[in-house]
């Protein structure tokens, strides 16, 4: 009904300004004309309600006629309803409202357009000297009379520039149009309200009253902030140097007088319960938005400049396209259509065909509403868990990026694939929700069209919210780019532009408005209530448990205060309640996201301590009842750790009567041999050697494994060596077992020992390549500059993968290693690239 103006920016007077004497006062704002820069102090004015209805203020001729017109409409309404019936009267005032609404949005819009671009009204007044006492034409005399009858006796027309006087006259015609617009609309609504409204629409009536009261607060608070100057489009006529405070309602919503300032329209529609009133209200509201778009916004941008601020995320989107030839803007599902469709991207076809398949399946096979409900429920739970899990693991360990890096892909490629997965999940879940809602709607026995229209309004609200979010944070933010491409962020500062100026997390509630709209459309179907609750809970959980912890980690702990929060926190009861809820919420989030052990007394055990414990336990199990002349020790007997690939030397000694030429020694994992110390019940898998060179001549055992064999009187002793050809290439605790004859009977068990991976330096690509080259040469698995997996049956590519990970902390997949033919130079370079990416993500 009443419009909003953007509060004026402070303007410092320029040089050469003319000063009109006798009007400037320090306590009042200074204004100046748009052309000529003539400075003056605006006279005090009053808002429309006081001007028209305050009996202590002077009334002009037009103001009296406006009051009379309001009263006449009320009397006319009563007379016509009595004489011609409510139906005819309602149509009469509907068309009258349409006329005045067009006078407002089209008439005033055209006048302001010409005033903004050509100062038409001001030039007309100057050319005809409308405010000069020398001009005695009827129009000039009427204009002077109108202003003098309105303003105080001390007001002198000729001391003020034409711009200000024209603005005062313009206000009178604005008051006439706005009051007629308001009065005719109210009378139309009153005639549409049923007599049983209180008994049959109690909830709707209560909600409607709340919306009307909220509308009143918006109007009052808006006028408190912008005053008469902006309320009546003063900057179309002159500029005012005043510093206005952006608070209250202007922190709650963009263009509050055009958006939430029309909440009363919808409140009255609820009270009336008539969908025709709602449609009329929507039409009037839509005209107001058109007025904003084609009249106000062009003037605002011309006078104050565009509100558009450089978007860091948009720069990142451009950078990704420029630096990565294979990257293109991702497919985004927006409502019922797609944007950024790439004709050469197969995933786009896959997404679109999936939607088409689901729709065709639903319309041709006609599944039951219950079946569609379960399909939607399962799809939403599955996709929400998948999205939340991926984002959580990506935030805590960069899991998704590492997954692609270790398989030879780039960081940007991982983000590219995530964009497809995220959009695909959203598309499938919302497609099923729309089809489920349609199926439920078709089976309704009765339809409340007012409720249905409100449902579609909520769907439009979610669509608008999504568009505003996408505009504010761009595609980079829409797809959670700060989880995947943290190194692309130049400014670690939260975005507070666009919709984020008013709401910190608009997607939390406005992002599910359409789901609750579906509840209204289906007349509060239990199925849709469950789905809407699920959508809301999933959104809140994602924001609280995943997004907010990650935002704190990336952007710091400074909280982004939204305009709505600032306004609501101005009310003490709400502020206190919010503090209590924040404390409860913090405890819950900490409990759900804590990785600490539930037993505080249970201290974490280091890896080294765990290994030592394992060795000690194994030592206690070694056979201790051998004859005193039997020996079986490793090396010098003091070392219990060997670096792969060894060698591991074992010295043994037996009485001659116990020795057999077919005795053999095998290498085993301690945990695989079990508690049986008398007999080995697991295979050595070829990791064994005889005790003398003459034994097992056809076994293919390497002769070099027998270092020493000697008979001395009543004893036999020797030394065997387990080198790279007989070695385990896996960290762990091992033991050697001496077996009697060609059997698995155990005579002696060595002290348990630990096999550890070699230390390979990885400070640079060259250093890592050289270390790998040296190790592979030691184990005779080097073929040129590459690892040969066929050279050693025990040394596989998985060991090489583990060695690289231990040396550098970087995980490369076996698939990738095979793809590059195990080239150690490429491995070194790739590891450094991945390390650089992961370091930048921290």
Swiss-Prot record:
Principal localisation: endoplasmic reticulum
Pathway listed: Phospholipid metabolism; phosphatidylcholine biosynthesis
Pfam families documented for this protein: PEMT
GO cellular component, one term: endoplasmic reticulum membrane
UniProt keyword annotation of Endoplasmic reticulum present: yes
Topological domain spans for side Cytoplasmic: 82-91, 194-196, 265-270, 367-370, 436-468, 536-842
Compositionally skewed regions (Basic residues) per UniProt: 8-18
Gene3D superfamilies per record: 1.20.120.1630
TM region(s), chain numbering: 61-81, 92-112, 173-193, 197-217, 244-264, 271-291, 346-366, 371-391, 415-435, 469-489, 515-535
Lumenal face residues: 1-60, 113-172, 218-243, 292-345, 392-414, 490-514
PROSITE patterns: SAM_CHO2
Region: Disordered, residue numbers: 1-28
InterPro entries (UniProt xref): Phopholipid_MeTrfase, Phosphatid-EA_MeTrfase_fun
Family to which the UniProt record says this protein belongs: Belongs to the class VI-like SAM-binding methyltransferase superfamily. CHO2 family.
Function of the molecule: Catalyzes the first step of the methylation pathway of phosphatidylcholine biosynthesis, the SAM-dependent methylation of phosphatidylethanolamine (PE) to phosphatidylmonomethylethanolamine (PMME).
Protein name in the entry: Phosphatidylethanolamine N-methyltransferase
């Amino acid at each position: 009904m009443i419009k909003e103006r953007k509060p004026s920016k402070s303007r410092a007077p320029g040089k050469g300004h003319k000063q009109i004497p006798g009007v400037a006062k320090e306590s009042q704002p200074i204004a100046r004309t748009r052309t000529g820069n003539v400075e003056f102090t605006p006279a005090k004015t009053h808002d429309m309600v006081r001007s028209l209805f305050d009996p202590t203020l002077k009334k002009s001729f037009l103001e009296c006629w406006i009051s009379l017109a309001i009263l006449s409409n009320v009397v006319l309404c009563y007379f016509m309803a009595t004489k011609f019936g409510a139906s005819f009267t309602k149509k009469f005032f509907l068309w009258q409202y349409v006329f005045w609404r067009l006078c407002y949005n089209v008439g005033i819009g055209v006048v302001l357009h010409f005033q903004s671009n050509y100062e038409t009204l001001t030039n007309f007044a100057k050319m005809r000297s409308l405010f000069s006492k020398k001009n005695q034409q009827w129009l000039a005399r009427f204009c002077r009379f109108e202003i003098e009858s309105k303003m105080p006796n001390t007001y002198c027309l000729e001391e003020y520039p034409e711009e200000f006087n024209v603005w005062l006259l313009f206000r009178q015609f604005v008051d006439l149009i706005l009051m007629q617009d308001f009065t005719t609309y109210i009378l139309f609504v009153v005639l549409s309200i049923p007599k049983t409204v209180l008994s049959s629409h109690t909830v709707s009536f209560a909600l409607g009253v709340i919306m009307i009261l909220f509308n009143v607060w918006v109007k009052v608070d808006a006028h408190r902030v912008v005053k008469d100057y902006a309320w009546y489009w003063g900057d179309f006529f002159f500029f005012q140097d005043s510093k206005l405070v952006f608070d209250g309602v202007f922190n709650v919503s963009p263009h509050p007088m055009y958006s939430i300032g029309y909440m009363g329209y919808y409140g009255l529609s609820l009270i009336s319960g008539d969908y025709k009133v709602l449609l009329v209200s929507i039409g009037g509201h839509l005209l107001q938005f058109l007025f904003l778009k084609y009249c106000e916004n062009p003037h605002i941008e011309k006078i104050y400049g565009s509100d558009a601020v450089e978007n860091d995320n948009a720069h990142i989107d451009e950078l990704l396209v420029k630096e990565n030839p294979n990257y293109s803007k991702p497919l985004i599902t927006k409502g019922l259509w797609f944007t950024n469709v790439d004709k050469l991207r197969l995933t786009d076809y896959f997404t679109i065909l999936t939607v088409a398949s689901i729709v065709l399946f639903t319309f041709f096979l006609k599944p039951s509403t219950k079946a569609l409900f379960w399909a939607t429920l399962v799809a939403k739970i599955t996709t929400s868990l998948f999205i939340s899990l991926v984002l959580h693991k990506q935030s805590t360990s960069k899991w998704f990026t590492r997954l692609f890096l270790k398989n030879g892909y780039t960081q940007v490629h991982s983000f590219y694939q995530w964009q497809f997965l995220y959009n695909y999940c959203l598309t499938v879940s919302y497609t099923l929700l729309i089809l489920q809602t349609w199926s439920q709607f078709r089976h309704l026995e009765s339809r409340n069209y007012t409720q249905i229209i409100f449902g579609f309004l909520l769907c439009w609200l979610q669509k608008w919210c999504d568009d505003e979010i996408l505009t504010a944070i761009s595609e980079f933010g829409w797809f959670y780019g700060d989880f995947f491409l943290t190194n692309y962020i130049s400014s670690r500062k939260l975005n507070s532009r666009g919709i984020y100026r008013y709401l910190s997390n608009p997607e939390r509630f406005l992002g599910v408005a359409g789901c609750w709209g579906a509840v209204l459309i289906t007349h509060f179907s239990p199925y849709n209530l469950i789905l809407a609750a699920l959508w809301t809970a999933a959104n809140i959980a994602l924001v609280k448990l995943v997004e907010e912890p990650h935002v704190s980690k990336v952007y710091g702990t400074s909280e982004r205060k939204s305009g709505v929060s600032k306004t609501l926190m101005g009310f003490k009861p709400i502020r206190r309640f919010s503090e209590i809820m924040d404390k409860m919420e913090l405890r819950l989030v900490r409990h759900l996201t804590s990785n600490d052990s539930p037993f505080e007394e249970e201290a974490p055990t280091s890896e080294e301590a765990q290994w030592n414990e394992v060795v000690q336990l194994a030592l206690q199990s070694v056979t201790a009842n051998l004859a005193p002349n039997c020996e079986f020790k490793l090396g010098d007997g003091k070392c219990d750790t060997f670096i792969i690939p060894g060698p591991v030397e074992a010295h043994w000694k037996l009485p001659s009567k116990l020795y057999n030429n077919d005795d053999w020694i095998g290498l085993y994992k301690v945990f695989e041999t079990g508690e049986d110390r008398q007999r080995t019940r697991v295979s050595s898998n070829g990791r064994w050697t005889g005790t003398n060179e003459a034994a097992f001549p056809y076994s293919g055992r390497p002769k070099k494994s027998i270092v020493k064999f000697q008979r001395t009187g009543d004893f036999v002793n020797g030394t065997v060596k387990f080198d790279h050809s007989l070695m385990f290439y896996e960290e762990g605790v091992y033991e050697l077992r001496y077996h009697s004859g060609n059997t698995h009977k155990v005579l002696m068990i060595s002290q348990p020992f630990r096999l550890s991976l070699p230390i390979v330096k990885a400070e640079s690509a060259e250093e890592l390549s050289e270390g790998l080259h040296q190790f592979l040469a030691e184990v005779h698995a080097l073929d040129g500059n590459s690892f040969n997996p066929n050279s050693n049956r025990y040394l596989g590519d998985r060991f090489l993968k583990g060695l690289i990970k231990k040396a550098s902390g970087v995980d490369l997949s076996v698939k990738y290693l095979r793809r590059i033919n195990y080239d150690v130079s490429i491995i070194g370079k790739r590891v450094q690239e991945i390390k650089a990416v992961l370091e930048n993500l921290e």
